[in-house]
């Protein structure tokens, strides 16, 4: 076997008949499969051992030669070579056809490749191939035209008239002769001449033909090879036949299809030998053609051949296509051994980097390791004995198992794996029971809960795999989410409520005003019942020497609560003492107002002081982010574990319960509802008098009820008791929100009807009072719609992710700096007066392109080509800078990827991105993963103008597929002033006139359009005239590529930020760059490119560079925006495209062009089984030998620590 890692590239082409015969180990002459009595393959049949190899290892068919010592001998009795039986997976046979047959892919595809080469319509071809018409091959001296079609009757008449002067034929033979007669070089020359003055349809057809003919010329494929004289028979183990219990056989559909071909072929041979009448032979040839069509692509033409139960048979094409096809089922995703799956349960006793593995599972998963160790320790005499011990679960085994799993990480995966955090590594800890235990903080990344979820476990076997799992995939590393760089492991539910309860303050609790010398004393007093967790007390600051207090503060007494003191004890030593949930306290240190000056009375101090709110979920996340920034991975993991333990501990002690008494009624409710009824009556009266339209009435009624619900909600919030458990849950961020409470204690409000419209009839009751039958019935619809929406959304979002990954999978960080001189000018993204994405978020973690100056003092804040970290970003924003020019993926010059500087910081680690990072895949996952959180609806802006604004998931799809947007905005094609907006009620339109410097344009808009400009405004080219979505295809024609890219980026960010989902700009930039990487050639100049060709920008530049060097005229082109599906299919890798969609079309085209797949992306390498060119698979890293490093102790998780150790070792040598 060739070593797949030595492949440079992979090429596909058409197979000539000789090539097919050279692959073959023998001709299959009979349709027999296996003998039903002896179960041995039949001679010359589809499973013949002489052709395909022996069915048993090292054993010929008749049994004369057995054992490996006869390797390579061909048996003189049965003719079978003695070799391994697995050759039956690779040896092919062939069928010698009695008449040529066309290949359906090349005749039927759109456009028909045969039709283009022969310049004939697919309809004419079909008539010839299936023996309905004759075609003139040589016209001789007759008035007939070459390639003219003749019906049976016409043919007989012409034959009688001209005799053998002309030649006509039918079937694939005729097509083959015509194809052989095509002079490709001459055709190409003629077509180039035609192109010089052709236009319209004629030109399009000529370009298409020239494209195919040039493809044949350059690839060295012969057009006649589209017609086959012999067809290959795939190896028998790829189309197996197995015996079921009860003596029946199950076989692959391919065997049936091959049998039909062989039967018809043999019958045709016999008829030809018998010199049968032409019409019978013709019919048999047609049937042979149809049988071969069915074998290659059943159902492409005519009715599909059906098997038992009228099920269409699966042909060779179907074996490749779709989710169950070879590409997606077996090449891109395989089932692996050393894996298991089980239900998950919570493991609060685990550390961040651990998971609980049931003993039975561990025994099976680590079986070979245990066997080896048992033999090594002489607890078993041999491997067989060791295996028996494991199967009987001997006592010796458990001790060995403990040692074997020590420091051997395992991977856990939960489906659906929406982003890279769906697979993480943990160290196993043995647990009893049958459920795997998952660390509660890892739930958020996996989106797991413990209501019956299952997870899969995989064991990395090789040393390299284990090292990679430990250093790169350990759960303790994955603290930040790759999509936005915010912590993804934040305490939730019980942990939040515990820490919330712990940091709560109450006035007048027992022991208030006591002063302690240190935390220990305070804790003892709490345990003995002298003070409460919520009591406000004083603690000597001098007892906390590590904390960053100011010199003045160190002499004072800190006024805090016992709970807060306990909470602060889990934070890293030098971290500020947190006494209030504010950013100031987090970053600048504890405010002075919480310190008792010497001699001051603590009780008076407390009387004057306000209650400080407890620490909520968001603040806990801020703490984690800050600790991560200052202390990195290890300290953060420790803090998280402590926060988890403390949270669970205190939430148990808090004794939080929920009873019906916690839901209190609202006495103002009847009055609010009565007022609403009154308003609704007034509105109805106005409608009856004809003062308002029905639409307006509807809108106003809905408004009234929404106001009523909001009033009730507001009153509820005001009447809340701070120690109400339900309030505590929602306030702390542990579970639920205010609207849940409104439904329990206020009113449920308006519901949507099945058609999606909101019903005017509100539900006035709440769940505490109980709903009436009608109210209950109305509300059930909403519940059902919620479920179906979620299911649809999941499917749509998953498909979106798949397309995104496919288009960006080859974007990898390939170099340090591409040296571009272009940058992206950015400012905050605004929608009206609302900030969608602030400048701080957009510049953080990016490189500057130009120096940033202070707008007031003109001092330099940041030089150029500097990475902007949090401090610099704050500096820039605080100085009042509104626009920064940064390095961006849009302007990166790196071929097939991006460079470190244009990408900036890796959001998942907070450090600079490294060469080899697969940023394209991460970007696709970051955009796709939150897809399930986006809404599915199209919002109606309502009112008279029933404009639909697409939002949520449909809008994202609309943008990335560059479809014509709904609610499209007209854009101005000139820069100038809006002179006039006049309405024309008769035609229900508005005319907008824009006067530019050179010309004036008038645009017609619908009367209901809401204007984005007003008279006298100065606008730029590409500005929207009315409110709506701009069509990017139109924008790219009017403006430049960068403006279009910027617009798309803004639009995507708007959708996500409106729904409260934060995604880093760089992810969106990478996706949009992939949509705009092609250009369409307008004028080829002196290059070899055809006009109208789609080319990669990089290839286009190379082509022009070569032409310029040779002194020719370069080609001109215009940028093209492709939707992601189209962009993924237009990639340079045919393997990647074929495994994505439209498999047969992609392969047909690639074969004719003799395409070469350079194996640049991830997918194509996975398909052929080569190491992927990302991470340690990059060519740069391929030849580094791993160093021997001792055992990595529990505390060391980070790569940088290891690198330091290695450098120190090197230095000491």
From Swiss-Prot:
According to the record, how does the cofactor bind?
A: Binds 1 Mg(2+) ion per subunit. Binds 2 Zn(2+) ions per subunit.
The record's annotation in InterPro entries points to: DNA-dir_RpoC_beta_prime, DNA-dir_RpoC_beta_prime_bact, RNA_pol_asu, RNA_pol_N, RNA_pol_Rpb1_1, RNA_pol_Rpb1_3, RNA_pol_Rpb1_3_sf, RNA_pol_Rpb1_4
Reactions catalysed according to its record: RNA(n) + a ribonucleoside 5'-triphosphate = RNA(n+1) + diphosphate
**Which cofactor does the UniProt annotation name?**
Mg(2+); Zn(2+)
Q: Could you say which enzyme class this protein belongs to?
A: transferase
Q: Which GO terms describe its cellular component?
A: DNA-directed RNA polymerase complex
Segments traversing the membrane: none
Residues bound to Mg(2+) are 449, 451, 453
Q: Which UniProt keywords apply?
A: DNA-directed RNA polymerase, Magnesium, Metal-binding, Nucleotidyltransferase, Transcription, Transferase, Zinc
Record-listed Zn(2+) 1 binding positions: 60, 62, 75, 78
Question: Which Gene Ontology MF annotations are present?
Answer: DNA binding; DNA-directed RNA polymerase activity; magnesium ion binding; zinc ion binding
One biological process term from GO is: DNA-templated transcription
The UniProt subunit note reads as follows: The RNAP catalytic core consists of 2 alpha, 1 beta, 1 beta' and 1 omega subunit. When a sigma factor is associated with the core the holoenzyme is formed, which can initiate transcription.
Q: What HAMAP family is this protein classified in?
A: RNApol_bact_RpoC
What function does the entry list? DNA-dependent RNA polymerase catalyzes the transcription of DNA into RNA using the four ribonucleoside triphosphates as substrates.
What family is this? Answer: Belongs to the RNA polymerase beta' chain family.
Record's protein name: DNA-directed RNA polymerase subunit beta'
- Species source reads Lactiplantibacillus plantarum (strain ATCC BAA-793 / NCIMB 8826 / WCFS1)
């Amino acid at each position: 076997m060739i070593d797949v890692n030595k492949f440079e590239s992979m090429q596909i082409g058409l197979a000539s008949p000789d090539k097919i015969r050279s692959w073959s180990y023998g001709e299959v002459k009979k349709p027999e499969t296996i003998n039903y009595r002896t179960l041995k393959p039949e001679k010359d049949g589809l499973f013949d051992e002489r052709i395909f190899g022996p069915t048993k290892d090292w054993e010929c068919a008749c049994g004369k030669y057995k054992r490996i010592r006869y390797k390579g001998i061909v048996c003189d009795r049965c003719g079978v070579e003695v070799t391994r039986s697995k050759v039956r997976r690779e040896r092919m046979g062939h069928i010698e056809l009695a008449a040529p047959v066309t290949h359906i892919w090349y005749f039927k595809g759109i456009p028909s490749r045969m039709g283009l080469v022969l310049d004939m319509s697919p309809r004419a071809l079909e008539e010839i191939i299936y023996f309905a018409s004759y075609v003139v091959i040589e016209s001789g001296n007759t008035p007939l035209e070459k390639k003219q079609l003749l019906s049976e009757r016409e043919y007989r008449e012409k034959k009688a008239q001209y005799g053998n002067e002309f030649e006509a034929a039918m079937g694939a033979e005729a097509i083959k002769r015509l194809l052989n007669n095509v002079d490709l070089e001459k055709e190409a020359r003629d077509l180039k001449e035609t192109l010089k003055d052709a236009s319209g349809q004629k030109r399009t057809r000529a370009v298409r033909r020239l494209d195919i003919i040039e493809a044949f010329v350059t690839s060295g494929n012969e057009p006649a090879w589209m017609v086959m004289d012999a067809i290959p028979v795939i190896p028998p183990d790829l189309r197996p036949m197995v015996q079921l219990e009860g003596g029946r056989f199950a076989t692959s559909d391919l065997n049936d299809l091959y049998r039909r071909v062989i039967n018809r072929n043999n019958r045709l041979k016999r008829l030809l030998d018998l010199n049968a009448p032409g019409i019978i032979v013709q019919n048999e040839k047609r049937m042979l053609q149809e049988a071969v069509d069915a074998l290659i692509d059943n159902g492409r033409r005519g009715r599909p051949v059906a098997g038992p139960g009228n099920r269409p048979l699966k042909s060779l094409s179907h074996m490749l296509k779709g989710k169950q096809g070879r590409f997606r089922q077996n090449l891109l995703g395989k089932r692996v051994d050393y894996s298991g799956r089980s239900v998950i349960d919570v493991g609060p006793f685990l550390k961040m980097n651990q998971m609980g593995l049931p003993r039975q599972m561990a025994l099976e998963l680590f079986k070979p390791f245990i066997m080896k160790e048992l033999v090594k320790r002489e607890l078993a005499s041999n491997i067989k004995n060791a295996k028996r011990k494991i199967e009987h679960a001997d006592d010796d085994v458990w001790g060995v198992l403990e040692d074997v799993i020590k420091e051997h990480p395992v991977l856990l995966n939960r489906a659906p794996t929406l982003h890279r955090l769906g697979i993480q590594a943990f160290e196993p800890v043995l647990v009893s029971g049958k459920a795997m235990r998952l660390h509660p903080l890892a739930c958020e990344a996996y989106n797991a809960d413990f209501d019956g979820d299952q997870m899969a476990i995989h064991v990395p076997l090789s040393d390299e795999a284990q090292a990679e799992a430990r250093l790169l995939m350990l759960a303790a590393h994955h603290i930040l989410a790759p999509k936005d760089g915010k912590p993804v492991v934040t305490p939730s539910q019980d942990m939040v409520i515990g820490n919330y309860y712990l940091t709560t303050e109450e006035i007048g609790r027992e022991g208030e005003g006591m002063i302690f010398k240190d935390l220990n004393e305070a804790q003892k007093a709490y345990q003995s019942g002298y003070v409460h967790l919520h009591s406000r007390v004083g603690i000597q600051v001098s007892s906390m020497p590590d904390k960053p207090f100011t010199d003045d503060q160190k002499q004072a007494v800190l006024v805090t609560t016992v709970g807060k003191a306990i909470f602060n004890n889990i934070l890293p030593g030098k971290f500020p003492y947190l006494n209030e949930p504010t950013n100031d306290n987090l970053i600048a240190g504890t405010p002075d107002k919480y310190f008792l000056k010497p001699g001051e009375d603590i009780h008076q101090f407390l009387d004057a002081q306000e209650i400080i709110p407890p620490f909520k979920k968001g603040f806990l996340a801020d703490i984690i982010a800050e600790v991560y920034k200052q202390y990195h991975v290890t300290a953060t993991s420790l803090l998280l574990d402590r926060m988890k333990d403390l949270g669970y501990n205190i939430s148990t002690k808090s004794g939080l319960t929920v009873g019906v008494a916690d839901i209190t009624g609202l006495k103002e409710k009847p009055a609010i509802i009565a007022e609403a009824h009154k308003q609704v009556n007034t509105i109805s009266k106005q409608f009856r008098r004809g003062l308002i339209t029905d639409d307006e009435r509807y809108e106003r009624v809905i408004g009234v009820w929404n106001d009523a619900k909001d009033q009730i909600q507001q009153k509820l919030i005001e009447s809340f008791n701070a120690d109400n458990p339900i309030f505590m849950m929602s306030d702390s961020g542990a579970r639920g929100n205010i609207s849940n409470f409104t439904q329990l204690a206020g009113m449920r409000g308006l519901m949507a009807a099945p058609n999606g419209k909101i019903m005017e009839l509100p539900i006035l009751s709440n769940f505490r009072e109980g709903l009436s039958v009608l109210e209950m019935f109305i509300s059930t619809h909403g519940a059902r719609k919620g479920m179906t929406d979620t299911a649809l959304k999941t499917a749509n979002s998953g498909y979106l992710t798949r397309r995104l990954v496919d288009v960006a999978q080859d974007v990898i960080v390939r170099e340090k700096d591409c040296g571009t001189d272009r940058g992206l000018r950015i400012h905050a993204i605004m929608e009206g007066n609302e900030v969608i994405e602030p400048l701080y978020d957009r510049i953080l973690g990016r490189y500057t392109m130009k120096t940033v100056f202070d707008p007031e003092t003109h001092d330099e804040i940041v030089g150029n080509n500097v990475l902007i970290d949090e401090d610099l970003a704050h500096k820039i924003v605080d100085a009042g800078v509104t626009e920064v020019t940064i390095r961006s993926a849009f302007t990166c010059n790196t071929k097939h990827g991006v460079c470190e500087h244009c990408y900036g910081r890796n959001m998942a680690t907070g450090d600079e991105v490294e060469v080899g990072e697969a940023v394209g895949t991460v970007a696709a996952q970051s955009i796709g993963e939150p897809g399930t959180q986006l809404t599915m609806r199209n919002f109606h802006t309502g009112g008279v103008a029933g404009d639909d604004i697409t939002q949520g998931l449909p809008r994202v799809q609309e943008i990335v597929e560059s479809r014509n947007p709904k609610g499209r905005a007209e854009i101005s094609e000139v820069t100038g002033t809006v002179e006039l907006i006049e309405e024309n009620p008769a035609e229900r339109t508005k005319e907008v006139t824009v006067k530019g410097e050179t010309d004036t344009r008038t645009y017609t808009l619908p009367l209901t359009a809401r204007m984005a400009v007003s008279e006298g405004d100065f606008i730029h080219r590409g500005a929207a005239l009315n409110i709506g979505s701009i069509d990017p295809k139109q924008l790219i024609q009017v403006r430049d590529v960068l403006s279009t890219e910027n617009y798309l980026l803004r639009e995507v960010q708007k959708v996500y930020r409106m729904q409260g989902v934060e995604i880093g700009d760089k992810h969106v930039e990478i996706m949009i760059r992939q949509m705009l990487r092609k250009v369409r050639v307008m004028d080829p100049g002196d290059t070899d490119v055809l006009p109208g060709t789609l080319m990669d920008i990089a290839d286009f530049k190379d082509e022009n560079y070569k032409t310029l060097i040779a002194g020719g005229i370069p080609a001109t082109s215009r940028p093209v925006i492709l939707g992601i599906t189209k962009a993924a299919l237009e990639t340079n890798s045919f393997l990647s495209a074929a495994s994505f969609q439209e498999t047969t079309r992609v392969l047909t085209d690639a074969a004719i062009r003799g395409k070469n797949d350079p194996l640049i992306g991830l997918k194509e390498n996975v398909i052929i089984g080569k190491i992927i060119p990302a991470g340690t698979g990059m060519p740069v890293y391929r030849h580094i030998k791993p160093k021997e490093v001792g055992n990595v102790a529990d505390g060391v998780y980070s790569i940088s620590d290891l690198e330091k150790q290695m450098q120190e070792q090197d230095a000491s040598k």
